[in-house]
Structure formats: structure tokens, C-alpha cells
Amino acid sequence: MVLLVVDAQELITTDKLYMADRFIANVKQLIGEARANGVEVIYVRHDDGEGCELTKGKAGYEIYSGFAPAKGEKIFDKRVNSPFRDTGLLEYLHSKGENDIIITGLQTDYCIDASVKCGFEHGFRVIVPNFANSTFDNEYMSAENSYIYYNEFMWNGRDAECISVEAVISLMKKSKNG
């Protein structure tokens, strides 16, 4: 079992996110519980390329300071929505014999959606903790509607198990105990 923290970067981890305070608190709690229970925390960063703020070398590219990686925790960089394409993450997870991935981060309707669906297609058991992903309003949907659409309709029971933070922590504790 691993905890993926996807694209929780300085530029986009802001108070404009849907349920921002709850999202930040839940991800912090999950990172702490993962570390306490021997569940590896893995970070993924998105690079939009030259000329964009969300690119290597820019302040907004860095992982959100509230979720800062501990020494030795892995960071994989990507240029597309899926963290599994050309990043080394898939090979790393396979080399460790991982079967279960807990997905948290940003944005629900972009990279989290791709992470969930691609993780499922690669044969992982995908677990999505409630209110541990978020997004912004867009011209077609409010952030709230996007969150509900993906977490309650699209993923749950199809590509992922969308469950409470408490249930995820319980799974982490069981994982530690064997």
C-alpha cells in the first residue's frame, strides 16, 4: 500500500479550491498516518513546460509546503495528466510488488481522474479518501459539482473505492500489522 500525493503544488493549492481547508487537513492527516504506519508516501508533480508558472524552476512548481516530503520520500515528475506515463512510477510500484494505491491531491477533474482510471487500468486497487482531492470552478461545472460527479458517480464502485478518511487510516493500520 502506498499513498500518492498528486500535483499538490504551491501554485494551485490555494483557498480557492473546493472545501480547501478540509482538503488540506485531510491530506495532512493522511500523510501523517501513512508515515506512522509504514505506508510509503510518494509525491507527483505536474510540469506544464517552458513559459508556464507550473514548471520546474518556478516557485509554483514546488510541492505545497504544508505537505512537504520527508527526507528520502520519492517525487516523480510528469508532463501529462497520468502519473504512470513516462515517469518511472509504474515500474517503481511494480518493482515493490505494490497492489493498493491511495490517491490524494489535485485536481479532481484533471490529474486525479487520470490517476484513478489509469491506476485501475494498470491493475491496482485504487482507494480515494473523501475530501482528499479537490478542484476549482470551471466554465462548465462548479468545483462542488465536479467533486461530487467524480467521487460519488464516476469512480466509486467502478475504478475506485471512495471511502472515508477514517476507513483509509484503518486500512493503513491493517497494512502495518500484516
Predicted regions and their residues:
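Short coil-to-beta-strand
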Residues: M1-D7
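Active-site-adjacent betaalpha module
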Residues: V2, Q29-R35, L54-G178
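Active-site loop/turn elements of alpha/beta-hydrolase fold enzymes
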Residues: A8, H46, F131
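Short acidic, Gly/Ser-rich segments with clustered Asp/Glu that frequently serve as metal-coordination loops
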Residues: Q9-D15
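Short, glycine/acidic-enriched capping/hinge loops at junctions between secondary-structure elements
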Residues: D15-L17, E53-T55
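A short alpha/beta connector and helix-capping loop motif
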Residues: K16-D47
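Glycine-rich, proline-tolerant flexible connector loops at the mouths of alpha/beta enzymes
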Residues: D48-C52
